From Swiss-Prot:
UniProt keyword terms in alphabetical order: Ribonucleoprotein, Ribosomal protein, RNA-binding, rRNA-binding
Function field: Binds to the 23S rRNA.
Alphabetical list of InterPro entries matching this protein: Ribosomal_bL9, Ribosomal_bL9/RNase_H1_N, Ribosomal_bL9_bac/chp, Ribosomal_bL9_C, Ribosomal_bL9_C_sf, Ribosomal_bL9_N, Ribosomal_bL9_N_sf
Protein name: Large ribosomal subunit protein bL9
Cellular component GO terms held in the UniProt record: ribonucleoprotein complex; ribosome
GO biological process: translation
SUPFAM superfamilies documented for this protein: L9 N-domain-like, Ribosomal protein L9 C-domain
Ranges of compositional bias, category Acidic residues: 179-191
Statement: the UniProt record of this protein carries the keyword Methyltransferase: no
GO molecular function, one term: structural constituent of ribosome
NCBIfam families named in the record: L9 (TIGR00158)
Positions of region (Disordered): 149-191
Amino acid sequence: MDVILLERINKLGQMGETVKVRDGYARNFLLPQGKALRANAANKTRFETERATLEARNLERKSEAQTVAEALAGKSFIVVRSAGETGQLYGSVAARDVVEILGAEGFNIGRNQVELNTPIKTIGLHNVTLHLHAEVELQVELNVARSAEEAERQSKGESLTSADAIYGVDEDALRPEDFFDPEADGNEDDE
């Protein structure tokens, strides 16, 4: 099906372009969301008459997204979750959790604007991409930790999954030569 795009859509085209898409994509997403019109003579003339208002609305949305992006730029958000000794979370941090965290800080972001291919399942520093507008994209850092104190240590660059961080033991002291006597022949019954 040929459609006229009413806004820029990633991997599809710019506003005003006539593109060919699958029927289901057009019927189930583009047309109901108001992102496109069927490409026929009546809709082409309708689009040309409304083009100025659509471009103005697009510029307004883009400027709003840029102000939010400037406010979010360089920010790090702490996520406290329970986790095992190895840093594996008992659960995960998904896109809806990212939306809740940003909402608590006063940023109104939709779940569809968060690009998180797989949920976060380990503690550590994770970068999450936000698509605020088709032309405005940024990354925020999530500091996933077991406590606020651990998040602070982690933000300074300390690894919380090492043996020292978990058990308070120096990893260098856990070398095999410390456990075995290289001089012994292996027979303990020589008495």
